[in-house]
Structure formats: C-alpha cells, structure tokens
UniProtKB/Swiss-Prot annotation:
Function: Bacterial hemolysins are exotoxins that attack blood cell membranes and cause cell rupture. Binds to eukaryotic membranes where it hydrolyzes phosphatidylcholine. This enzyme has 10-fold less activity towards sphingomyelin than its C.perfringens counterpart, is approximately 100-fold less hemolytic against mouse erythrocytes and at least 100-fold less toxic in mice.
Keywords attached to this entry: Calcium, Cytolysis, Hemolysis, Hydrolase, Metal-binding, Secreted, Signal, Toxin, Virulence, Zinc
Domain comment, as recorded: The protein is composed of 2 domains; the N-terminal domain contains the phospholipase C active site (PLC), in a cleft which is also occupied by the 3 zinc ions. The C-terminal domain is a putative phospholipid-recognition domain, which shows structural homology with phospholipid-binding C2-like domains from a range of eukaryotic proteins. The ability to bind membrane phospholipids in a Ca(2+) dependent manner is conferred by this C-terminal domain.
SMART domains: Zn_dep_PLPC
Molecular function terms, GO-annotated: phosphatidylcholine phospholipase C activity; toxin activity; zinc ion binding
Organism: Paraclostridium bifermentans (Clostridium bifermentans)
Domain annotation Zn-dependent PLC: ranges: 27-276
Protein name: Phospholipase C
Amino acid sequence: MKALKKVSNILCVLGLCTLMGGTSYAWDGKKDGTGTHSLIAEHGLSMLNNDLSGNESQQVKDNIKILNEYLGDLKLGSTYPDYDPNAYDLYQDHFYDPDTGNNFTIDNSWYASYPIYDTSRNSVRKFATLAKNEWEKGNFKEATFLLGQGLHYLGDLNTPYHASNVTAVDSPGHVKYETFVEERKDNYALNTSGNDTTSGVYKEAMENPSFNKWMTQNSIKYAKIAKDLYYSHSTMSHSWDDWDYSGREAIKNSQVCTAGFLYRFMNEVSNGNTGDNDSLTNEFNIVLKTADNKYAGTDDNVYFGFETNEGKKFEWKLDNAGNDFERNQVDNYILKTKDGEEVDINNISNYWIRKERLTSISDDWELSNFKLIANGKVIQQQDVNKVFTGNETYYINK
C-alpha cells in the first residue's frame, strides 16, 4: 500500500535526518547562488573563458558569450539541488561510488528504507540532457539553470566523502571535512586549467564522439580520483595538513572538471554534434511534472510504457520512495528493461501513460508535461495538460 510505504519512509527519514543533521553536507551552497558549488561553477566558466583558443568556431564563441550572460542562472542552478522541494529527503542522489555504481541506500547496511537508484552520475547526465534540449530551443535562461544543476552533481562526484558513500551517519568527518573546505574555498579558486582548449582536459572532453558515453566516462574518472583522495587524505585519522591538501585537490579537480564539461556542452549545442548514433539502450529516464492546481496530485498508481513495431510491450510502475505526483512536483524515474534487454529507440511505435485507481474512489491526477531521455537525448516530450480520472490510459504516438 502506498500509505504504508509513505509512513515507513517518513519514520526512517525522521530518524536518519536526526543522525545526519537533515542535510547532505556536500560542497556548501546557499539558496541565493553562493557558496562552494557556486564558486566551482563560476571559476569553471572563468577557466573556459581564459583557456579558449582563438581557433574555436564562431558558433562556440557565440554560445559561450550567451552562457556568460546567464552566469547568475548558472550559479543559482549550481546550488538549487540542495534546496529543491522535490528532492529526496536524505539527498541520496548526491552520492555515487564509482566501484559499485550505487549510492549509499544500496551499499550501506544501516540504511533500512527503500533503495534509491538515482546517483550523482545519473543526475549529471539527466540535467545536461535537459539543458541541451532547452538550449536548442533557444530557452537559454532555463537551459543554463538546468546546466547549473548538472554541475552541482558533477561537484558532488568530486567530493571525497560522496564518492565513497560515507555519510554523516558513517563518520562525523563528513560534516567536519566539508565545513573545513568551505571555510578555505577562496584559497583553492583557480582561473585557468593550465592549457588552452586544444589540449588537456578540453581535448579529453572531445575524444569520445558520444556525449552520453563521455558523460558517464567522465563521471567515473573523477569520482575514482575523489574516492582515492578520501582514503589517502580525508578521513578522521588524517591531519589538518592532509585535509588542506585534499580540499585543494578536490576543489581544483571540481573546477577543471567543470571547465571541460562546459566546453563539451558548448560544442554539443554549437555544432549539432550527432555522435550519439547508438539507438540501442536498456535504460530510460522519464521526467514528469504534475500541474500546479489545488487537486492536481494523486495517490493512485501511475505507469509508463511503450510498444515496439513488432508488438512487444514494456511497462513500468512509477514509484519512488516518498510521495510521488504531488502538486507542482517534478518526478524522475530511471527505467531499466528486464534482464538488460536492449531496445532500439527508433523501433518504438507508441508510448503511453496510465493511471490505475488504487481504491474504489478515484484520485484524479493532472499531468502538465513529460520528457523521456535515452542515450543522452530527449527522445519524446509533450505538454500533456490533461486530467486523468479513474483507470485511464493516455497514448502518445511517436
């Protein structure tokens, strides 16, 4: 029952929030777009500006100019995930161990609530893909805000404690270390990577023709560096000098990683990069927004599915820990095919969203819009603006 699930989850969250202090304590970020996350985003862009080769295409230069004009939105986006009212209560998706591929809800034995499969690695890809989609429509302000959110999770990947799945429950060092770094962040700020955009991190950012695969590869690379830094210089048994070295390296890596990421993103939106030609996938990511009306939310079950040209059907129940489909809420779901079966996204004939009545009394649901992501691209999107009543299926033809 959803009600039982919610009660169990609330009890677990209340207990864990007491232990964790009610926050994830990653790199610090303030709601007004200041703090460590903001510094990383701003200096990552500053690096790109200063390192930009004169041989870059005019399209890249023009788009970087636009990005600079929306720096404030980039900084606001870079701190927003810590204040998002729709966020997981324990910020579970801000963690990612590159060796297990999981966040702490799966890896840490003390976590007794429902597992969360979102990680900072997945979140980087999701927000960058959504940002690219909006940028290509000319919605630069919204795109930059979404890109900033992606950079937030990229920063989390570079945080030693987050890349090791060591929470404030596991060690008091989590809060102490990140507070230590926050107090010294300005000492760690950089304005160049040491290379221009023809070499170094920028050259590496362009080596994989697939944006989606590169994002995954890049996240794993930097998370491994951060995890190694945790065990070598960042635990409670290490000295203040060790922590200073760790903080300096971690913030440097965050800024350099951000500069490379922004460079790749600018090339993607400038050159119409079509490197992601792989149409096979076993994983989808759907993002749905419930309307901002008084009775728009629902406790009924919601499903998403599609059918291939051969008539094979796939369907998933959309059910995260906590409350799904609340008024004005954006919900995100990672959908994996059974046994890792690969689906050709070019071979999908139609999609559907289905509401199933949970009790004898229907709990209507008003869906505003949705976006479906696969292989680093938004492959389906629609402003639905529809009220679902009773047991109802809404078909979306490709």
